[in-house]
Amino acid sequence: APMDFVAIDFETATSVYSSVCSMGICVVENDEIVTVKEFLIKPTPFVFNSYNIKIHGITPEMVENEPTFDQLWDTIKPYVQNKLIVAHNASFDTGALCATLHTYGIEFPTLKYICTVKLSQDAYPDFPSHKLNNLCASLGITFSHHHAAEDAYACACVLLRIMHDYNLSSLDELCEKFNLEVGKIYPNCRVPCLKKKKKKAKKDTAAKKDKPKCNISYKLKKAVKSKKKTPKKSDTI
């Protein structure tokens, strides 16, 4: 059966995960791209870092009259709720989604997600780089980098290409081929998308067979905590 999924991409106003200023969505149904959308978003707090502006070109003036993420959530939620979400470096994009929802006190949606960085590294190990722009150049996919809708479109194209090149037709086949553990978001936690560890000797696995697969202790606070970074000068001005 052909795969249905939604590729997403966030751009942020600062290095803080919850400072989303743009979201791109690319909907794929029956292996066909059917919708590409971009939402401009007014971040909370309304602060921009010049470094981020240089990357994506979104200025405070461009979003000052746009809705905040909580105002857009009723529109965005149907695109992600109970869907398979795909992102290039999914830990960032799902982290941005959860951090932003947490900022507004909104319950997380329920969804599964996979990462095209992890997949492309295994699918195309000889490529010089697996950054989205370089990966797409190697695959002949044309897009405009660091525009959220374009990045979501490119990410969708990458997954469709991997499925085609390896003759795969389902999420189960994809995960089996590339030894991937699907990431999950629940109303109170986020479980990472990981490469499965190779099985150890049987005596080791027998002792652990009763251990639950989803570690629910990966709670909200942990899910939205971004890596501690030294604040950049431009962030603190």
Please provide the spans of the model-predicted regions:
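Conserved non-catalytic scaffold segment of RNase H-like nuclease domains
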Residues: 1-111, 125-126, 132-146, 186-194
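Ser/Thr-centric signal marking residues that sit
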Residues: 10-12, 116, 155
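Histidine/lysine/aspartate-rich catalytic loop segments that bind and position anionic ligands
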Residues: 110-120
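Acidic, divalent-metal-coordinating active-site segment for phosphoryl/phosphodiester hydrolysis
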Residues: 147-161
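Acidic two-metal-ion nuclease catalytic site recognized across multiple nuclease folds
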Residues: 160-237
